Swiss-Prot record:
Classification of source organism: Bacteria, Bacillati, Bacillota, Bacilli, Bacillales
Catalytic activity: a sphingomyelin + H2O = phosphocholine + an N-acylsphing-4-enine + H(+)
Anything else known: It has a high specificity for sphingomyelin, hydrolyzes lysophosphatidylcholine at a much lower rate, but has no activity towards phosphatidylcholine, phosphatidylethanolamine, or phosphatidylserine.
Function: Required, with sphingomyelinase, to effect target cell lysis (hemolysis).
GO molecular function, one term: toxin activity
Family: Belongs to the neutral sphingomyelinase family.
Species of origin: Staphylococcus intermedius
Keyword hit for Phosphoprotein: no
Gene Ontology annotations of biological process type: killing of cells of another organism
pH dependence per the entry: Optimum pH is 6.0-7.5.
Keywords, ordered alphabetically: Cytolysis, Hemolysis, Hydrolase, Magnesium, Toxin, Virulence
Cofactor(s) the record lists: Mg(2+)
Top-rank lineage group of the source organism: Bacteria
Record-given protein name: Sphingomyelinase C
């Protein structure tokens, strides 16, 4: 979110893939 764009993006992508 703040200062962790890459980490957050990776998490979001993983969440989407899991769905």
């Amino acid at each position: 979110a703040s200062g962790e764009n890459q980490a957050e993006l990776k998490l979001a992508t993983h969440n989407v893939y899991m769905l």
